Amino acid sequence: MKIKYLSGVISAVTVLTALQSPCAIAQTGTGATGSDSGLEEVLVTAQRRSESLSRTPVAVAVLGTESLARQAVISEADLQLAVPGLTVKAGQSSNQLNYALRGQTVDSFSSSRASVLPYFNEVQVGGSASTAFYDLSSIQVLKGPQGTLFGRNSTGGAVLMTTAKPGEELGGYVSGWLGDYENRKVEGAIDVPIVPEKVLMRVSGYYQKADGFQENIRTGDRGGDIDRKNLRVSLTLNPTDSISNEFVLDYADVGGTSMVSVAYNTVPLGSSFVPTQLLYSPGLDTAFATPGLWDLFLAAHPGTDPEGFEASVAKQRERGPFKINSDAPNIRENENYVMSNITSFELSDTLKIRNIIGYTDLDSQIASEFDGTEYPADSGGDIGRIGNLKQFSEELQLVGESAGGALSYVAGLYYSDEEDNTYSLSQIVDLSPIAPVTKQINNGRTSNETKAVYAQGTLDIGDMTGVDGLSVTAGARYSEEDVEFKHKADDVYIANPAPPGAVFENPLSDTFEQVSWTLGLQQQLSDDLLLYAVTRRSYRSGGFNYFAPPLAGFGNEGGAEYQEEKATDFEVGAKWEGTAGDVPARLNIALYTMTIEDIQRSNYVSIFGQLAGITVNVPESEIKGVEIDGVINPTQWLSLGASVAYTDAQFTDSAVSVLQNPEVDFGPYPDQPDWSGSVFADLSFPITDGLEGSLRADVYSQTSSYFSSTADTLNPGSKIDGYTITNLRLAVESEDGGWTVAAYLKNAFDETYYVGGIGFASLFAVNTVIPGAPRTYMVEARYKF
């Protein structure tokens, strides 16, 4: 396997090097400037400074303002279709989302931090609620461990969202669209130069209201309703030529409902902690040795299928995921404030100080069906999960160049203080009026204080080595995280403590210290071709389980704590941008291998009679992969592109035991298809003088994947099929008039597919899944002024 992998690396580099021959490419000369390929230059900030994508020695995908609009990327789900290799996973509902990249993910009900972290204007933001992408200048997806440059360490990658900055002239845009499912959206922004060049303001807003895709045949309500309001104020101050300040405050108020999980498959009776197939069926009479109990239950729960649990799951499969029979309330409320403040002070032409302040205040409530059926086996009741996450961060950077520009560097100090208060209600096995419902309350506060110091630099060693264009990159970061978790008085593990002999410690606390590093070598062979190799070490912080009694020690040993997850990778890549003959083109290739130790994964278990999803450490895994993307413009009016990602992720040491529960082997790897890819064609054509038309088609496809880490053992049947999605856009634009009218058709062939699920088979004998969006259409009118 390693020989095949190495041969692939050599072959890829050979192909790109061959493109440098005079017959294959029109050279534009050598030097430090970008290639004159005819393609629009793409700028990225993956190394905390602005540079061309083609000269950045890391794997990164970028969507600019125009790409976001043409592909109608307005949410996380759209982002997955635009960036193969990135998975946007839904857990309990369609509005509880997490990114997965290069095999790194976070399980539902896990207490661990996400492995792929989102950033808003360089400020790391928490939470897992779905968001709206509007008035952005770019979205960048950084792939692989991020341990030396960004606010927090991560083992999978980062998603960087950058908002549009205020302009120097009065202007802006307004956009509105209408679609099926009563989908209405209004969006706009205006630039106001309060003091020309000195004080610039931009105000943008977003409003969307739509009916959900799911129909609840029991209540007539819909799952997935959207009622979203966003407002953003950006203020840029330039008091002098060397000092600038960029302030952004973003507010979101989101209501509606969620698309809920639906039953996917069941396991045989006796395979789960709760025998739902027996309790919710005519067999209830036998279970309690009392005739008439099932009829009594049905009378108290009108609308429930009298044939029982197994028959209900089969009927749900026949109905499809958009007609549900749910007995649980469906609530979704979010109110979020996110602030970023970036001050830059240029000490000289080669030295700059940057100060980045961030603040987030995220309130949320979400309640929905858990078990995916019409029976009250497990739900959040009328409360569900209520959370408040507050975070303050401060980062001081020194950015500069020295040695005549041969050395570029970034050094900094980072501090953050975070508090997460979460109250969760689970209603389990409601057999009323025969037996009372079990209400499990989990209520706790997690505090995290992080301090870090880091530095990274790139040195041109061409003169020293005699190899033109050769440079080396090295970076390191020391992080210290103080984590504390406290169960509150009404938490199930405090109100109903464990049997004698189990010593509680409340609060629990620990300090996690780690050194992350980056070491890379890159060569700019010409203006058009960059080759690089890099190895990185990063980690995901340890912590304490929310759904576990406060027992000292790690979960694998019977305690409530889980250890840091550590990732070490090696990546080689090539980036080429030039002209093949007279045709502008761009090609990026990355090949990587990564070893993960103490992988943080969820295990659904029973602890002292309470059901819990707790984070454990799986000893080791290995991930290998290849990522390729390219664009070619055969003519000025046609652009073609394709990308593909292959991921081979395996647990290599997978056995884990938790408290009194049996040992479990983890595998296969969840949330990661082996193959994913996309192709697009973008055609522009004149209509009349001043009017231009465009037609774009995007096709995304992926192979099957698993939504449970224990599909081979505890949760069989938690595999979802691969799928192919086609999106179309037809637009007419008047550049002089400043207006555009566009029609979109998403999921054109109405493919039924699933974007995540929960492996509940070991607890409730059923696995559940969340569907992706069905076919939708919309028409947008946009005007720039």
Residue map of PLM features:
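N-terminal Sec signal peptide and the immediately downstream disordered periplasmic leader
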Residues: 1-71, 77-82, 734, 784
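Outer-membrane beta-barrel translocator/receptor signature
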Residues: 97, 114, 134-137, 143, ...
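Membrane-embedded beta-barrel scaffold of Gram-negative outer-membrane proteins
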Residues: 342-346, 352-358, 362-368, 530-536, ...
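Gram-negative outer-membrane beta-barrel transporters
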Residues: 29-33, 409-414, 463, 472, ...
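Periplasmic-side early beta-strands and strand-to-turn transitions of outer-membrane beta-barrels
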Residues: 160, 168-169, 177, 193-286, ...
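Periplasmic N-terminal accessory/gating domains of Gram-negative outer-membrane beta-barrel systems
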Residues: 28-30, 58-107, 116-133, 138-147
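C-terminal beta-signal and adjacent terminal beta-strands/loops
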Residues: 37, 539, 637, 700-710, ...
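Surface-exposed extracellular loop regions of Gram-negative outer-membrane beta-barrel proteins
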Residues: 108, 255, 417-421, 494-498, ...
